[in-house]
């Protein structure tokens, strides 16, 4: 299934039904008076977070959503039925913005969470509402109100506990494939990963956490270079960042600092998240290799996805950072 993390849709709530102009017409009641019913309310448009969805792909094919209008009022004071509401399901982690103003409308995170996106128009009042002491037979009823209509942008931000961050070919996809059941495409060339991958990492017999592998960052990503900010937003919701640098690179410390710089330019709040430095590809480094000094107060774990060395230490460190109060 193709991964799509942005879409634009137009929603239209139902118009209200018109009020009715009607008068009693019964035998032996020559002046029956007004009896027009009220119109029904138009249908609302709701958004609902659904944990069974993982992409916004469906919205690339269906872009317009419209609820039903309310039914018009009838004689004998019969009110029109309310128009049927519609519920649009979106993946958990979907941010909704007004396409015109850019204003954030809602952020749907929890499964089943709902938001009223467009309100249906009120039903018009029938002619009995307009009687006065001097006007006993009004020939006027109120039209139904217009339902709200707006254009919105949907942005999906993945819901994961751990975000893997690194330059292309840092070993992110290989690492997530050995720690979880995820099977991303792996090859020895840059930008093998073109979309984010999610994997569930088991911890012990009954515990687990979710890890996200996003496409490799390059210098200038915050300004849109490479795959740019298209995927950087997917690490905004993570609880901890695993910053990967390749042990066989020429300047691991320089790579690390560049990665931090790109994240800070995109969103300074990313650097406030707990992070763990993961030095990968330890199976191919020279025997004389010694781990460089990165940051004194940030955990540093050397690993090899090939020999599996360091993986349990990394798994434990990630779990303890995500859940400091759960053994």
UniProtKB/Swiss-Prot annotation:
CDD domains reported in the protein's UniProt record: Obg (cd01898)
UniProt-listed PROSITE patterns: G_OBG, GTP1_OBG, OBG
Protein name: GTPase Obg
Compartment(s) where it occurs, according to its Swiss-Prot or TrEMBL record: Cytoplasm
Similarity field: Belongs to the TRAFAC class OBG-HflX-like GTPase superfamily. OBG GTPase family.
Residue span of region Disordered: 120-145
Keyword terms: Cytoplasm, GTP-binding, Hydrolase, Magnesium, Metal-binding, Nucleotide-binding
Gene designation per UniProt: obg
């Amino acid at each position: 299934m193709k991964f799509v993390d942005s879409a634009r849709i137009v929603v239209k709530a139902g118009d209200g039904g018109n009020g009715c102009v009607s008068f009693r017409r019964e035998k032996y009641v020559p002046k029956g008076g007004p009896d027009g019913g009220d119109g029904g309310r138009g249908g609302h448009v709701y958004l609902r977070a659904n944990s069974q969805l993982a992409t916004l792909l469906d919205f690339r094919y269906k872009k317009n959503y419209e609820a039903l209008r309310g039914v018009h009022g009838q004689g004998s004071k019969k009110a029109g039925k309310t128009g049927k509401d519609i519920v649009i399901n979106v993946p958990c982690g979907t941010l909704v913005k007004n396409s015109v103003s850019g204003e954030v409308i809602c952020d749907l995170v929890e499964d089943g969470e709902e938001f009223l996106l467009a309100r249906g128009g009120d039903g018009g009042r029938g002619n009995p509402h307009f009687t006065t002491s001097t006007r006993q037979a009004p020939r006027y009823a109120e039209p139904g109100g217009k339902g709200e209509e707006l254009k919105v942008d949907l942005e999906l931000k993945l819901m994961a506990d751990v975000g893997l961050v690194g330059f292309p070919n840092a070993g992110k996809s290989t690492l997530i494939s050995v720690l979880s059941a995820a099977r991303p495409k792996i090859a020895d060339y840059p930008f093998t990963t073109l979309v984010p991958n999610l994997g569930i990492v088991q911890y012990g017999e009954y515990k687990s956490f979710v890890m996200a592998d996003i496409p490799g960052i390059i210098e200038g990503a915050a300004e849109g270079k490479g795959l740019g900010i298209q995927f950087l937003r997917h690490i905004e919701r993570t609880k901890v960042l695993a910053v990967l640098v390749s042990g066989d690179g020429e300047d691991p410390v320089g790579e690390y600092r560049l990665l931090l710089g790109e994240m800070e330019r995109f969103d300074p709040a990313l650097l406030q998240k707990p992070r763990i430095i993961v030095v990968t590809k330890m199976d191919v480094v020279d025997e004389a290799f010694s781990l460089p000094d990165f940051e004194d107060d940030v955990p540093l774990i050397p690993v090899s996805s090939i020999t599996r060395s360091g993986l349990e230490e990394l798994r434990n460190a990630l779990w303890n950072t995500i859940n400091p109060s759960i053994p």
